[in-house]
């Protein structure tokens, strides 16, 4: 029964999505966002959905514009190995759409598959007053495989930043590093994560490395039958370096963005689902020509 539910939900999400990279921004196709992980004891599998909307207006000619939509449906899962290790896997499917002054273009398919391995470096439980304080520190890393389609000739002078960003993958093996810290006191908790992604090149073309940091505060409200509701809020910061072709820096790529985020998680020991949204309060992408409107995330996840 559980397997049938997972398959049905995956099909429903897969059939309603629609994406695209910005015309001149350095967003790229791969964006592994962890958020709040489900609090299951052993292993889990689920489906996540991510939406992003970017708008671009060319600085020198306002008649040249693009509205870019990233929608990603992602199969994800994790398994705890002993008490120290957590292995995570992500299989994304992108549905790309761009509306610009030249018309509408789409590009859909499998993205770059990612695997992460995290090690619990520190675990401390202490008592303060009537409340216990739990702290955990995880460190880890992973690899992003070039499974997404990347079929442009980057050395062709007619190829634009938009053509490269529209690809379903980066065409390269890329590496991820992360640190996660969680502290819980009573029903309150804070989850903070730092990620850094280092990219290799595809035929000399290299997407800019990306630094991401976020911190989320949540409050767990117990319900009947072991259910709980956890509203959450936090901040996220991303900085992406400019793309390069050989030793040449590609103009109108890279930038930073700072978002405020909020959401809610609902679950028990067998199932978890949640939604969240992000709104930018400061950003500068592609020389200020590209702006993020908002991001949305949702998931449904099952313990196995």
What label would you give each PLM region?
Residues 43, 84-87, 124-127, 187-190, ...:
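Repeated loop/turn-to-beta-strand initiation elements of outer-membrane beta-barrel proteins
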Residues 102-195, 203-206:
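Outer-membrane pore/translocation modules
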Residues 41, 69-73, 108-115, 135, ...:
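Residues that define the transmembrane beta-barrel architecture of outer-membrane proteins
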Residues 35-36, 47, 75-79, 89, ...:
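Residues on the lipid-exposed face of transmembrane beta-strands in outer-membrane beta-barrel proteins
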Residues 50-72:
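Surface-exposed strand-loop-strand hairpins of Gram-negative outer-membrane beta-barrel proteins
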Residues 56, 205-304:
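Outer membrane beta-barrel transmembrane domains
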Residues 19-48, 52-56, 125-136:
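Outer-membrane beta-barrel biogenesis signature
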Residues 43, 47-51, 89-93, 139-145, ...:
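Transmembrane beta-barrel strands of outer-membrane/channel proteins
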